[in-house]
Amino acid sequence: MTTAQTTELDVQPSPLALLLLGREADPRSERGVECPGDLPSPSDPDLVERARAAKEKLGDKVFVLGHHYQRDEVIQFADVTGDSFKLARDAAARPEAEYIVFCGVHFMAESADILTSDDQKVVLPDLAAGCSMADMATAEQVAECWDVLTEAGIAEQVVPVSYMNSSADIKAFTGRHGGTICTSSNAKKALEWAFEQGEKVLFLPDQHLGRNTAVRDMGLSLEDCVLYNPHKPNGGLTSEQLRDAKMILWRGHCSVHGRFSLESVEDVRARIPGVNVLVHPECRHEVVAAADYVGSTEYIIKALEAAPAGSKWAIGTELNLVRRLANRFAPEGKEIVFLDKTVCFCSTMNRIDLPHLVWALESLAAGKLVNRIEVDPETEKYAKLALERMLALP
């Protein structure tokens, strides 16, 4: 479990005012606090200077992490940028930083807290910045799934592999049951390792990354994969289906990458002759199969860096990153467009805006610890074990 605190540095935590995150009515999906004090107005013309001044006052005591999907107004203040795992490791490599301000979403801040020292404090500028995919697998649901696998007589054959985009509770479950974490960059290595440990894999929470890696990279068939729906009795599967499957995929997905369709690919090819279609592996299987290139955010960036001048690219990932890359490479004559005609930001990632960042930095500069993300020791122990197994992958 994770706690979120907003406190004076020298006093006890004040009561938390909960915010409902997303559309779920389940109270377990509630997370976040209202910002105590005055949140700066988005129209404040001094926001940039206020952020710069607060960061300068904090000096080496603060280390700001910016995920690739963040707004430009926020990313300009990041000391480093990257995907979730890279940023968590970067934070752990800066032990002199007392405060880690994570401009990302909740599960990322949890991972940073797990990998950093006890003396470091991880802050999320807006605690309502969650991840719909991470919230699609709760600890209770996954425990129930394991009971279903046990009743089917296959639990001992199953190795859990959890995507980095999961809660600390799910990472801890994975660690307790002998599994590992994976990223979109090393999912193949994680699956290869898992199949050396057991006959089957429970992959969660992103069905698409699991399916794409198993079929595209591992040579499994679609028939080797079954979809476990936590909202149906026994996951909507028979014991025979579970026993026959090699990949048990959790019914979760990324709300952004799940929007891209085969029609999106066909349309962009018709509009832009010679375009290269490059998508993230969180996209649907048919989209990945129709793309020219598939890879993580880091892969996408490197592919565009290496692309020749005059090349044309349609990118299937979050719009903030695509826009930033289009602007960056336009002077080199590289045409970069968003794969879908419908604008699609990550709404929860976009909750981290400049006013929230200014509020967090100014609060820390004034001696007030706000929005701290803290994973409890028991959860941290097993989540870290799962992360360490990933770090040990060849």
Residue ranges and their predicted role:
Residues 2-316, 320-394:
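Active-site loop-to-helix "anion-binding N-cap" substructures in soluble metabolic enzymes
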